[in-house]
Every structure is written in structure tokens, then in C-alpha cells.
């Protein structure tokens, strides 16, 4: 299994020279199995960088949201594959309530 960290920061992204060594994006990881299946964990600002990894990937994209705090979802609007009409995206929400389920 391969794990790529695209973002590990807290509440807000912090780009700049002071964070270039460890990165400044909010949470986003991509897990890739030995048979090339991919799972995205969280949709923080690192998801924008992960978009490049999914350009040639034609299988359904699976996104697991650990929870719905802003720093774990704020990269979603910048994830290029969501704008591709034929792209299949499966989203697994974190812990939800009935109100969350209705909103989603």
C-alpha cells in the first residue's frame, strides 16, 4: 500500500516559506492499494494537489470524509474531477446525524 500526504495542517492552509518543508495544506491523503485502487481520506486544501493524480485514473473515485469540519472539506470545490460529467465519485461521510444525512 502507498500513502501520499497532500495536506496535514490544521484549521486553515498556511502556505509560505516557513511551511514549505512539511507543507501548508489542510488534511488530504490518498491511499493506493497494490492493485491501483485509490481512496481519498478527507478533502482539505491538499485535494487540489491530488487532482493531478486522478487525471488518468478512470476507476470510480472514493472519498472518505472523517468528519465535516471546514479544514477537512474546504478543498472539495477545487478537485478537478468533480467537474468531469462522466466521472463517478463515491463519498462516504463521517459520523452524521439525521439532519446531516438530509442535507447531504
Feature map (PLM): residue ranges:
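Binuclear metal-dependent hydrolase catalytic cores
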Residues: 1-104
